[in-house]
Design a protein with these regions (language model features):
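Active-site microenvironment for binding and transforming phosphate-containing groups
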Residues: 1-213
Length: 213
């Protein structure tokens, strides 16, 4: 279950019991870079590329998922309608932050991130928690036929990006009870979230972060 904390960050109740974990999904009112000055990010390119942060901070090149298992390190992705996903392996103390827009979803970035966690850290998909944060909802995400057809059976006039990524995570082996979805639409809630579709070039960015204390 998602809830808003005193720092205006959405957290996941089921992840709060993991004592070494830093995690959250920022809002318009939260300043994540100020809180974590050694934050690692990527130039996001709507791909299925996964990058290992290895304790580094700052901008670490191009890609759409950042992996980390270094104590004291925090990784993040930036969104403004795209779906942010956090992966957490309590057993191996490893995390990933994933950026899934429609192109990344079609490229199966969620699946690629689960496989990268397995290959780099030995994470079993069934051990992972996956938190799907605020993004544009099916209610607001109307697309043209050229986009809809890329989603196969999910290719309707309104695309449910969060559900498409939930299905990818499930197909990758993440168990249903460990997939936590916010069901919060960024376009519907201007008081809380930035939205590129709503605000265009004036839109800011929301940070979704995960790290190891």
């Amino acid at each position: 279950m998602f809830y808003l904390d005193s720092r205006h960050v959405y957290r996941v109740t089921e992840l709060d019991s993991i004592e070494w974990l830093e995690h959250g999904f920022g809002t318009r009112l939260s300043d994540i870079p100020a809180r974590f000055p050694r934050l690692a990010t990527l130039k996001q390119v709507h791909s299925a590329a996964c990058v290992a942060a290895e304790g580094r901070a700052g901008a670490l090149g191009t890609g759409d998922a950042l992996l980390e298992n270094t104590p004291g390190a925090v990784v993040a992705v930036k969104t403004a309608d795209c779906i942010p996903i956090l992966l957490v392996d309590q057993r191996t103390r490893a995390v990933a932050a994933v950026h899934a827009g429609w192109r990344g979803t079609v490229a199966r970035i969620a699946l690629a991130a689960v496989e990268a966690m397995r290959d780099r850290f030995g994470s079993a998909p069934a051990d992972l928690h996956a938190a799907i944060g605020p993004g544009i909802g099916k209610c607001c995400y109307e697309v043209g036929p050229e986009v809809a057809q890329r989603f196969g059976e999910w290719g309707r006039a309104h695309i449910d990006l969060a559900e498409a990524n939930r299905l990818q995570l499930s197909a990758a082996g993440v168990t249903a009870g460990r997939i936590h979805a916010s069901n919060l639409c960024t376009m519907c809630r201007p008081e809380e979230f930035h939205s590129f579709r709503r605000d265009r070039e004036a839109a800011g960015r929301l940070y979704a972060f995960a790290g190891i204390r």
